UniProtKB/Swiss-Prot annotation:
The keyword Phosphoprotein does not apply. The potential N-glycosylation site at Asn-115 is not glycosylated. The lineage of its organism: Eukaryota, Viridiplantae, Streptophyta, Embryophyta, Tracheophyta. Glycans are attached at N115. The active site is at C150, H286, N307. Keywords: Cytoplasmic vesicle, Disulfide bond, Glycoprotein, Hydrolase, Protease, Signal, Thiol protease. It is found in: Cytoplasmic vesicle. Residues 341-360 are annotated as: Disordered. It comes from the Eukaryota. Its main location: cytoplasm. PANTHER family: CYSTEINE PROTEASE FAMILY C1-RELATED. Residues 357-360 are annotated as: Prevents secretion from ER. This is Vignain.
Amino acid sequence: MQKFILLALSLALVLAITESFDFHEKELESEESLWGLYERWRSHHTVSRSLHEKQKRFNVFKHNAMHVHNANKMDKPYKLKLNKFADMTNHEFRNTYSGSKVKHHRMFRGGPRGNGTFMYEKVDTVPASVDWRKKGAVTSVKDQGQCGSCWAFSTIVAVEGINQIKTNKLVSLSEQELVDCDTDQNQGCNGGLMDYAFEFIKQRGGITTEANYPYEAYDGTCDVSKENAPAVSIDGHENVPENDENALLKAVANQPVSVAIDAGGSDFQFYSEGVFTGSCGTELDHGVAIVGYGTTIDGTKYWTVKNSWGPEWGEKGYIRMERGISDKEGLCGIAMEASYPIKKSSNNPSGIKSSPKDEL
């Protein structure tokens, strides 16, 4: 991004993309007004459809518009909106964005279990709230596109975070390297597990920057020349004790944490703002990262979760999810499959030096 005029134009584009798409109840009253709403939505999101496809997509959009409208009339602590997924069925959405084969694998033998310890076990007190964004340990929201690479984005958030904590430098790292090169256990756009990705980064001696190995949103051939220029290394990873939100709280108080959740519900698909308390199960199908926690004025506890569906989704790319519920697994299974990277020092590989373009 260049300075002055180009910077201003880029900022205007970002604001346009993240601007909320609103509609009035009257736009739902007739088929004609609904068509007008659909065309306005398509223009807002620059979605092109063939004539045949438009009719099919309009019917889906109409159903979703009614769902969003009816849900927002209810007394819930969160709201929905017609986002970029509004003409996708929930089944299509799940298959494309949350069907990434992140499964609860620790019940099976052979999974990467870290070093078998939990370094934060003896932590007695934690702050009332934590926001790693405000501490400068979180990069801007990214977009995985139509590729089931959420596991890579979840992994990278946690590694970027612990690297900033140890070095005081925030460096955007490469999800595409994981997609292309971490293929022994993980499956690129067809899904993967964060624990395997942490192990890959450790074994390879680090991971390169996003600038050196940019994201493409498809499975490519591993570029060995780029892979052999690691910028940030880790010393391993640990798993948070399963089904224990108190243990998860201790971990998040000290660094961003990778988690898996069930993100396939309609309310999650169209989440806009507020503390999400919606219906969801524990069929873990999406990798995200917790970058903080807090409590609302009315006393509702929440996790601050960074997603990888772009800044237009949710609260500028984030979702606040209810924390401390009665189910031990946590809302949407958030406490079932949490892990974080270990970095013992500020030392990093010398294969490539971070540039001003890399550091944020």
